[in-house]
Amino acid sequence: IINDNVRIIINDGNFEIGDWNIIHNDTLLISKDYLKIKNNVWIGQNSVLDGTGGLTIKNGVRIGMQSQIWSHAKTGEEIEGCILNVAQPTTIEDEVWIQGNCLIGSGISIGYRSIGLLGSVLHQNINSNKVFKGNPAKEVNGLKMYRKVSEKRKMRLMMDWSTEFKSIHYQDLEIINNDNQIKLKLNSDEIIIAIDKPSKIIKNFTYFIISNKQFIKTNSFLERTFYKFLYSNKARFNYN
């Protein structure tokens, strides 16, 4: 979904965007070298994503409103001897959450599942599973936002959500549950939820794989409506 007044400026660069992304109002996207946005990305309004030096936004990233992510810095006049002309690739890894009003400098890498608290100004790389805040931003020791969830527990959650989805949307949805798989069936559409990818893939079935968060899509009606139900904060899966 690309909302009102979003501007995408492509200046000889590559622009790539995946599935199930939301870009809110008045956001500016620039691709001079490259700008790559993968799947399940949410970008708040009035944000800036600068791909002048190359910018990669990976799966499941959340970017709060009025945030800016840069990949270049340039000012002053060459004729006067200014040497500030930097373009470096910036990378935001999977499932990073950048809260509102954050600034990310050029050439920065933010590791998997790290979180930038409100108003952070980041000038250095951040490792995976870290929380950072402040200006200049620094890591906050001892603060964790995730807990370990077993694959068995994940399957129970998916079963609970399947049942909830049926009660809200489709009373005639058929749900079949066994130890390793959950099957959803509505008319000719079928979804398989499994811990691991089955050895045999049935054509025209949608598969949600728990172990690697991947899904094999068919773009069926049931797939789209079920994934829309999950997508916000229940579970997200990535299509390759």
Place the predicted regions along the sequence by residue:
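Flexible, glycine/small-residue-enriched loop-and-beta-strand segment within the central core
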Residues: 1-109, 135-136, 141-145
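Hydrophobic/aromatic ligand-binding patch that stacks against planar heteroaromatic rings
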Residues: 60, 113, 131
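C-terminal/domain-terminus segments
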Residues: 110-124, 203
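Residues that flank catalytic or metal-binding motifs in active/ligand-binding sites
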Residues: 65, 118, 128
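Terminal amphipathic alpha-helical/low-complexity segments used for targeting or macromolecular assembly
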Residues: 135-240
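Contiguous mid-protein beta-loop-alpha structural module that forms a pocket-lining wall or clamp
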Residues: 122-129, 136-140
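Short, solvent-exposed secondary-structure boundary motifs
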Residues: 58, 111-112, 123, 174-176
